[in-house]
């Protein structure tokens, strides 16, 4: 603390005038003698501190001691107000001034300078002209509050001109239409990278928000803005005053910055002048083994850090007791949580179970005993008998590691039966119990070991393996040589075939197809191809889909070798409806594979006209092991176009010798079957090609039409009203489909971008009108949810 001399006279006047000053003042007036007289026993502060003390004393005298307590609380860290403390040397002067102001003897302090300096300043100010005095007064003004920031200035970021225009235009629309427009825009353009600045974590979001505020102030100006602008337009002097104040504030900030830099420089120079390495060892203290000292108990780094924080908080706020109570409460909470945790037992069941990964924590919870509820008392200071002083102790040396378990300590795993090191047993148990199929893996590994290495098999396995060997090698252990190898392949374990399933991801599609094709043999592929082509007769024992004739008797096809001896009354292999003008069939010769078409019906059996003779064909070369079945040269008019000859393996269609077929006789004219009746209009799906032109439809139909919209029932979309209701709208035919979507949005809340409309099998587009799709009165439109990224179903 600054110390001042205890004196009866202030220091400024010289020694010759000291005894004369009080006598002159007493002669002038007795009333002013009391405040001007120096008091013996009071330390007078320096002029700059005296001004603060006098002002504070005047305020405290007027407002009471509550004001003093408020100043002491607000300025607790300000050293200029240390005179408020009772232990400060200037506190007596402060109390003296407070009593003088209460009695009305003291005057309000004008400045913290001596009287001689005040008289000189008054004389000089009287001599100066008025303009200079005004300048001096203006220079002493210090701005208190910063000027208001510019509301319509925002530095644009370094982006392209197009992106800047997008941000500005979006901000203008948001300022005009409100926050609801911003929410809808974010939902609609959430996948558009051009509008990423709408997200709060984007770098342009602050600039966008500033633009919205500026546009909002322009479109919806505050109440006093017009009055302020009108006043500034009529009185330019006010604008100049604002500019001058802003300039003075900039100068003040610059002076403050320079002052801080000068203080830092002074502090740096003061630190540089200290020779930190210039020290002298005064004394070395050696502690003897039998010496007993009153030292505090040892602390941990955590406790030391907590003590430092408590001390700093006490110096700052004076809340040491509350902090200690908070620390104790935290420790008690942790102890209660640990005590409430029940000790869990490790499940030793060998069945397949889904184990949690927290098994290690549970085991540790078993081994570690719960902490005691009562806090442990602090350790007592060590006694001389217990203290061991080590002279070679190095606190920086690394602590010795705990002894590792011996490498030859192995434990048998209860899961796999393998020998596991003791250090890795816990990790092995955790990993083994994570897999619920460890039993299958264990059995499979045991079987593989038994089949690979028979040397280490137990006694019963040796007996069974010898029996298997005797059954396979009867030339050694028996008398029949024909039984050699009869058991080969029979002892193979019949493993259940794992079905290949697809998980639904596009990345695993090719891998799943390869896995499914790996289990299919070549024979199964050939059979599947011939079943699809119709070359193989279907099994009548299997259940067929679709209606069948009640009087139809399924018959097996005759062998190919007796095809020439079939009587004329034998029915064909497959019969189809035919017109009445068709002549009766004579013989069945060739089976043709005709693909199934929707209409007209096609025949699967080729019949020859009467009078034709079947001659034997030359033998077919068997090198490629395939038979080519040729088609007849002509066919009845009811048959479909002739397909190419089918290539059939010999295992399914043997090729008997057949004579070449001569040209048949001219067939009588056959009338085609009557066409099938058209399907009803409700079952037909329209296409855009079948629609009537828009102009012609408008000429035929005039006036508005009533349209029904079938809304789906989607309970998971709670934000939309999709309860399966039917919406009815009356619209003119010239309106576009987008008008319907807007009305659906108003009724259900479903955005137009999420709507998918279908009318009679056609997905209608927004840009086309109702007349384009030939919508009549009472047309029904089905509403569905548009799935982004997927194909239209």
UniProtKB/Swiss-Prot annotation:
The keyword Ubl conjugation applies. It comes from Bos taurus. Keywords: Acetylation, Isopeptide bond, mRNA processing, mRNA splicing, Nucleus, Phosphoprotein, Repeat, Spliceosome, Ubl conjugation. The gene is SF3A1. SURP motif 2 mediates direct binding to SF3A3. Residues 320-334, 354-364 have a biased composition (Acidic residues). Component of the 17S U2 SnRNP complex, a ribonucleoprotein complex that contains small nuclear RNA (snRNA) U2 and a number of specific proteins. Part of the SF3A subcomplex of the 17S U2 SnRNP complex which is composed of three subunits; SF3A3/SAP61, SF3A2/SAP62 and SF3A1/SAP114. SF3A associates with the splicing factor SF3B and a 12S RNA unit to form the mature 17S U2 small nuclear ribonucleoprotein complex (17S U2 snRNP). SF3A1 functions as a scaffold that interacts directly with both SF3A2 and SF3A3. Identified in the spliceosome 'E' complex, a precursor of the spliceosome 'A' complex. This is Splicing factor 3A subunit 1. The modification N6-acetyllysine is found at residue 55. Residues 680-702 are annotated as: Required and sufficient for nuclear import. One of its GO terms (molecular function) is RNA binding. The modification Phosphoserine is found at residues 320, 329, 359, 413, 451, 508. GO terms for biological process: mRNA cis splicing, via spliceosome; mRNA splicing, via spliceosome; U2-type prespliceosome assembly. Residues 509-518, 563-572 have a biased composition (Polar residues).
């Amino acid at each position: 603390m600054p110390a001042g001399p205890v004196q009866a006279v202030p220091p400024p006047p010289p020694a010759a005038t000291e005894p004369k000053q009080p006598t002159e003042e007493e002669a002038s007036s007795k009333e002013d003698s009391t405040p001007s007289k120096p008091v013996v026993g009071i330390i007078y502060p320096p002029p700059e501190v005296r001004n603060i003390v006098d002002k504070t004393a005047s305020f405290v005298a007027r407002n009471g001691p509550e004001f003093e307590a408020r100043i002491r609380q607000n300025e607790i860290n300000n050293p200029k107000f240390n005179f408020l403390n009772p232990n400060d040397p200037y506190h007596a002067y402060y109390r003296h001034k407070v009593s003088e102001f209460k009695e009305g003897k003291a005057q309000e302090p004008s400045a913290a300078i001596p009287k001689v300096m005040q008289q000189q300043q008054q004389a000089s100010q009287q001599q100066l002209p008025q303009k200079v005095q005004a300048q001096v007064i203006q220079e002493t003004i210090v701005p208190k509050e910063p000027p208001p920031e510019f509301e319509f200035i925002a530095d644009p970021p370094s982006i392209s001109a197009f992106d800047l225009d997008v941000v500005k235009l979006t901000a203008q629309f948001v300022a005009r239409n409100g926050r609801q427009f911003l929410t809808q825009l974010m939902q609609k353009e959430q996948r558009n990278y051009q509008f990423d600045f709408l997200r709060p974590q984007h770098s342009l979001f602050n600039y966008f928000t500033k633009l919205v505020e500026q546009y909002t102030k322009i479109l919806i100006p505050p109440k006093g803005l017009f009055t302020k602008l009108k006043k500034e337009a009529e009185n330019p002097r006010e604008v100049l005053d604002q500019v001058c104040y802003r300039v003075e504030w900039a100068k003040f900030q610059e002076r403050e910055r320079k002052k801080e830099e000068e203080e830092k420089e002074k502090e740096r120079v003061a630190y540089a002048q200290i020779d930190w390495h210039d020290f002298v060892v005064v004394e070395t203290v050696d502690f003897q083994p039998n010496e007993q000292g009153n030292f505090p108990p040892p602390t941990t780094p955590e406790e030391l850090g907590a003590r430092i924080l408590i001390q700093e908080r006490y110096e700052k706020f004076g809340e040491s007791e509350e902090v200690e109570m908070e620390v104790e409460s935290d420790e008690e909470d942790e102890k209660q949580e640990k005590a409430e945790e029940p000790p869990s037992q490790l499940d030793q069941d060998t069945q397949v179970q889904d184990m949690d990964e927290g098994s290690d924590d549970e085991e540790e919870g078993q081994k570690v005993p719960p902490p005691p509820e009562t806090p442990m008392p602090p350790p007592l200071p060590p006694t001389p008998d217990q203290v061991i002083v080590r002279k070679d102790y190095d606190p920086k040396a690394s602590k010795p590691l705990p002894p590792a378990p011996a490498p030859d300590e192995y434990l048998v795993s209860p899961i796999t039966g393998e020998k596991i090191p003791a250090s890795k047993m816990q990790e092995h148990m955790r990993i083994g119990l994570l897999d619920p199929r460890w039993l299958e893996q264990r059995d499979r590994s045991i079987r593989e070991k038994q089949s690979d290495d028979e040397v280490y098999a137990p006694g019963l396995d040796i007996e069974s393996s010898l029996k298997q060997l005797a059954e396979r090698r009867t030339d050694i252990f028996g008398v029949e040589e024909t039984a050699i190898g009869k058991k080969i392949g029979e002892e193979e374990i019949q493993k259940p075939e794992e079905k290949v399933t697809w998980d639904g991801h596009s990345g695993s599609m090719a891998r799943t197809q390869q896995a499914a094709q790996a289990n299919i043999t070549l024979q199964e592929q050939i059979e599947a191809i011939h079943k699809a082509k119709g070359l193989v007769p279907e099994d009548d024992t299997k259940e067929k889909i679709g209606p069948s004739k009640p009087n139809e008797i399924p018959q097996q096809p005759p062998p190919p070798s007796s095809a020439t001896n079939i009587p004329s009354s034998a029915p064909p292999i497959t019969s189809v409806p035919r017109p009445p003008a068709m002549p009766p069939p004579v013989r069945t010769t060739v089976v043709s594979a005709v693909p199934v078409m929707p209409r007209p019906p096609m025949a699967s059996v080729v019949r020859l006209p009467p009078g034709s003779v079947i001659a034997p064909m030359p033998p077919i070369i068997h090198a490629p092991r395939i038979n080519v079945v040729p088609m007849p040269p002509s066919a009845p008019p009811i048959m479909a176009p002739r397909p190419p000859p089918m290539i059939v393996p010999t295992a399914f269609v043997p090729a008997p010798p057949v004579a070449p077929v001569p040209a048949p006789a001219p067939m009588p004219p056959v009338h085609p079957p009557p066409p099938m009746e058209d399907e009803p209009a409700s079952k037909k799906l329209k296409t855009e090609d079948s629609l009537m032109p828009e102009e012609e439809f408008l000429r035929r139909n005039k006036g508005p039409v009533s349209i029904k919209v079938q809304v789906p029932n989607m309970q998971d979309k709670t934000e939309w009203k999709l309860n399966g209701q039917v919406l009815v709208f009356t619209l003119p035919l010239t309106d576009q489909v987008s008008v319907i979507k807007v009305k659906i949005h108003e009724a259900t809340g479903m955005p137009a971008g999420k709507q998918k409309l279908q009318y009679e099998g056609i997905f209608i587009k927004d840009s086309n009108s109702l007349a384009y799709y030939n919508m009549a009165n009472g047309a029904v439109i089905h509403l569905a949810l548009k799935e982004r990224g997927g194909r239209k179903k």
